[in-house]
Amino acid sequence: TINSRTINYHIGVNIEKLFDLLCEQILAGLCFSTSIEGKCNVCSDSKREEAARLAAKFISKLPAMRKILATDVEAAYNGDPAAESYGEVIFCYPAIKAISNYRIAHELLELGVPLIPRIITEMAHSETGIDIHPAAKIGTHFTIDHGTGVVIGATSIIGNNVKLYQGVTLGAKSFPLDADGKPIKGIPRHPILEDNVIVYSNATILGRITIGRDATVGGNIWVTENVPAGARIVQTKAKK
């Protein structure tokens, strides 16, 4: 039975189980990535030590991750009049599943864990229809309403208190190529959304542009230029 007297014991046991599982998965990622590069195909003791170190470091970040996820739940609850409780948001909202997977994957990626972060976000993508690359940088109180069809590219930067609706794409406008005609990796190519931005359904925002603080982007709009802070970008009204 879990109660106030036994909770610390249960947490300790589950953290130990988590550590073992993480070590196994991180080790698999490390071995896979080096075998692909042709360096080796054997998981050495040094890799096992590295996996254990990374797993321990990730676990140390769990309290901070929990705090930031709590802000995401709060944002979803406060932004949806249909939400009746925090519990409903946590268990029923696909965006929370996708954002949770992203937060976990992002921390693993920041630690240098190969492959596993992308697998984690793609699991959420398959389940929810929300595609968030683990390399994207996203602030607190982030929410996605409905969520289906949202795409957030690898070099996207999203501030605090940002809200996206279904079908929003934060994508690249073009891909610079090297001398062999292949895309150059790592170049910032996705949008920056500053604090308190709202982007409504099916808006497409492309390229390394900035959507300024407190701006609103209306639905079904294609945006490829900077949007000033506080601006409202909407479709031109049809003439009667």
Regions found by a protein language model. Give the residues of each.
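Structural signal for interior beta-strand "rungs" in well-ordered beta-sheet cores
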Residues: A124-K240
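Terminal amphipathic alpha-helical/low-complexity segments used for targeting or macromolecular assembly
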Residues: T1-I119
